[in-house]
Amino acid sequence: MQNITDSWFVQGMIKATSDAWLKGWDERNGGNLTLRLDETDIAPFAANFHEKPRYIALSQPMPLLANTPFIVTGSGKFFRNVQLDPAANLGVVKIDSDGAGYHILWGLTHDAVPTSELPAHFLSHCERIKATHGKDRVIMHCHATNLIALTYVLENNTALITRKLWEGSTECLVVFPDGVGILPWMVPGTDEIGQATAQEMQKHSLVLWPFHGVFGSGPTLDETFGLIDTAEKSAEVLVKIYSMGGMKQTITREELVALGKRFGVTPLASAVALY
């Protein structure tokens, strides 16, 4: 019999959560991660499912996600512990046929529940499914240190933060040409912040929560982790630049345009036109 803990999706979640903790992005129970699956991914492991799956209603119906399975991190769970006990810290859930709630098929033992940011994740999944024609499958939220730091010293403006991150490392424009959305500060774990995040996810694969963290979306766990890692590396460079007195020279507008042409991407127009 196949064991679900050996599946590609459980092993992928173990690696992503462990790597994020080692990066320092997910202290204590900070951060959350969800991966949209297909029925064919989970079907071979039906023997591992709970005999009586718990049902939890969603705070608002999400018919676009009807009958869709996900693997999710748990509420109050520490990323550093996922590798030690996947079944206690992760869960496979499946949305019901009308999108009103979900059953916990596997994991989240001892009456654990999915992350408190599940509304933000599911709403963002809906928008990224539409924006990428189903290509994006991962939503990752973490407390990337230097990205958070920048929200204290830069104007919280999409065009400005995007432009500065592009300048912080040449690869950034290629990796996230659609730029970085940013919200006003909001109380986490609410439908309101979930809706605001999803609205930005219509246009951007990265969304900053000022003084809190970042949301990233991508087609795979590796791509999504790499997206956040790239932005965070640029933010680290910028933090060092500002601590050394600021930029003396940088990548110019003309050079950014040339970079986009070379790699066949269309940079966010408002960030290119900023100066």
UniProtKB/Swiss-Prot annotation:
SMART domains xref list: Aldolase_II (SM01007)
Cofactor annotation: Zn(2+)
Query: Pfam families, per this entry?
Result: Aldolase_II
Residues annotated to bind Zn(2+): H141, H143, H212
Question: What SUPFAM superfamilies would the database entry show?
Answer: AraD/HMP-PK domain-like
Query: Does the record bear Protein biosynthesis in its keywords?
Result: no
Q: Does the keyword Secreted apply?
A: no
Keyword set, alphabetical order? Cytoplasm, Lyase, Metal-binding, Rhamnose metabolism, Zinc
From which domain of life does this come? Bacteria
Give the subcellular location: Cytoplasm
Q: How is the cofactor bound?
A: Binds 1 zinc ion per subunit.
A single Gene Ontology MF term assigned here is: rhamnulose-1-phosphate aldolase activity
What positions constitute the catalytic site? E117
GO CC terms, sorted: cytosol
Q: Which InterPro entries match?
A: Aldolase_class_II_sugar_metab (IPR050197), Aldolase_II/adducin_N (IPR001303), Aldolase_II/adducin_N_sf (IPR036409), Rhamnulose-1-P_Aldolase (IPR013447)
Top-level EC class, please? Answer: lyase
Identify the main location.
cytoplasm
Write out the GO biological process terms.
pentose catabolic process; rhamnose catabolic process
Q: In the Enzyme Commission scheme, what number(s) does this protein have?
A: 4.1.2.19
Q: Which reactions does this protein catalyse? A: L-rhamnulose 1-phosphate = (S)-lactaldehyde + dihydroxyacetone phosphate
Assembly, in brief, is: Homotetramer.
Function, as annotated, reads: Catalyzes the reversible cleavage of L-rhamnulose-1-phosphate to dihydroxyacetone phosphate (DHAP) and L-lactaldehyde.
Family, according to the entry, reads as follows: Belongs to the aldolase class II family. RhaD subfamily.
Q: What is this protein called?
A: Rhamnulose-1-phosphate aldolase
Q: Which organism is it from?
A: Salmonella schwarzengrund (strain CVM19633)
What gene is this protein a product of? rhaD
